[in-house]
């Protein structure tokens, strides 16, 4: 029996609140169990210098944990005058995940800033951020599309992320913090609704893991991705109809 009574192949309860803040073009507050993340998407009518003149857009992300999102206060990055390695790794991961399902050429020379702020952390903050940020991204792109329809709708597919791991020799989905801290193997999986992998991050925390265990964890992760994408679709409802069509109807 897991800490919260879930089955091994079950994700935590997910609650999505769209249009959470007033000013951002896309804003989602996502709760996965006790992990809570605010995902805002802002649009700029310019691109980084390395993208100028290409006709393509860009998507970049910033990730931050509020000081009391954890059991003990976390010092703000600004107070240390540097971004820690974990934060840098996660925000790059979020950016890669979202760029993987967007036709940047179709987007045009615009930058979409993804800001993910962890309000409360109980495991899976990076996966929660990716899954929530995708919904906010759709809202932001749809806002552009309604003002001036894209010739080709830029978002090609859904993308979501989940964690899997081996705890007490059990393979489990969507680890909370207590489970994550005891995991023999910890893995983050990012996939599209078409079943394609975007990224797999797997670590043998206590010991190596076998190819068989890897395959079983990937299968478990795929089940979790389907559950999370169903949540995304239910949240977006009719606003998801353009995804993958390439059209402007």
Swiss-Prot record:
Its EC number is 2.7.7.56. Phosphate binds at residues 86, 124-126. GO terms for biological process: rRNA catabolic process; rRNA processing; tRNA processing. GO terms for molecular function: 3'-5'-RNA exonuclease activity; tRNA binding; tRNA nucleotidyltransferase activity. The keyword RNA-binding applies. SUPFAM superfamilies: Ribonuclease PH domain 2-like, Ribosomal protein S5 domain 2-like. HAMAP family: RNase_PH (MF_00564). This is Ribonuclease PH. It comes from Clostridium botulinum (strain Alaska E43 / Type E3).
